[in-house]
Amino acid sequence: MKAFLFAVLAAVLCVERAHTLICFSCSDASSNWACLTPVKCAENEEHCVTTYVGVGIGGKSGQSISKGCSPVCPSAGINLGIAAASVYCCDSFLCNISGSSSVKASYAVLALGILVSFVYVLRARE
């Protein structure tokens, strides 16, 4: 009986843990609410990734959100004031529920862009 229990214990310890990472997935969505479809990642995909791109000029703005599984973790971000892009990654169950948190608006650059737009429009009327 002890030999059987020892064999079962050895088998359990030697078996690799099953890959069960599940991430939210979407492509080019305009809202985070459209990105709530869970998918099971492939064995080599160990990270959930969220890619965010946002643009705002004057009173018009737009954004694109993509989510999914990835074998690498490419966290990065850039903020140019009127445009921003970021990639956020994590590695736990449904961890990419939110949009990327690394993008922050630069209100000074946005205000400067709006001011330059107004000056351009006013000069175009002359």
Curated annotation (Swiss-Prot):
It is a lipid-anchor; GPI-anchor. GO terms for biological process: lymphoid progenitor cell differentiation. Expressed by thymic blast cells. Residues 99-126 form a propeptide. This is Lymphocyte antigen 6E. It comes from the Eukaryota. A lipid is attached at S98 (GPI-anchor amidated serine). SMART domains: LU. It is found in: Cell membrane. Residues 1-20 form the signal peptide. Glycans are attached at N96. InterPro entries: Ly-6/neurotoxin-like_GPI-ap, LY6_UPA_recep-like, Snake_toxin-like_sf, Toxin/TOLIP. Pfam families: Toxin_TOLIP (PF00087). CDD domains: TFP_LU_ECD_Ly6E. Coiled coil: none annotated. One of its GO terms (cellular component) is cell surface. Disulfide bonds join C23-C48, C26-C35, C41-C69, C73-C89, C90-C95. Residues 21-98 form the UPAR/Ly6 domain. The gene is LY6E. Keywords: Cell membrane, Disulfide bond, Glycoprotein, GPI-anchor, Lipoprotein, Membrane, Signal.
